A protein has these predicted regions:
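Mature, solvent-exposed C-terminal subdomains and processed small-chain segments of exported/organellar
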Residues: 1-41, 46-144
Length: 144
């Protein structure tokens, strides 16, 4: 789900950012975040209220693009490469060391950075589509 979420809305190459923010200029910012141990994806945007319905429609379209395996190979490859670079760069940071200790002690995740990178490299188009097909809208919240 990490790669799928990256493709959806984490990175500057993501569908939400490149389509809704850059192509249509419907919002000031838009992103998705994945709560890894809760299995929750949150999508947030800052926009004018007259664009809310258009944005919701476009969000669903971007999710469907991933669900239906209609995305460009470059999006998948760029996303994997960006995450791999970020993991390598952060490997020696204090916050990453603390995160690794948390994963190991609290959730019994013993994977090393190299193993996580190896797992990222194995992610396929079908893997991404499959996990996005499990996505279910639970809450739709607007703060105006």
């Amino acid at each position: 789900m990490i790669i799928a979420n990256g493709m959806l809305g984490v990175l500057p190459t993501s569908l939400l950012f490149s389509v809704i923010r850059e192509k249509y200029s419907y919002c000031y910012s838009i992103y998705s975040s994945f709560k890894i141990y809760d299995g929750i994806i949150k999508i947030a945007t800052s926009c004018n209220k007259e664009n809310i319905e258009k944005i919701k429609e476009l969000i669903n379209e971007q999710i469907d693009i991933i669900r239906n395996n209609k995305f460009d190979d470059n999006l998948l490859n760029d996303t994997k490469n960006m995450y791999i670079s970020n993991y390598r760069l952060a490997d020696d940071s204090i916050s990453n060391i603390m995160w690794s200790n948390y994963r190991e002690s609290v959730v019994n995740d013993q994977r090393t950075t190299d193993k996580i990178i190896e797992d990222f490299m194995k992610v396929t188009r079908d893997d991404v589509a499959r996990v996005m097909n499990k996505l279910v809208l639970k809450v739709d919240f607007e703060l105006i």
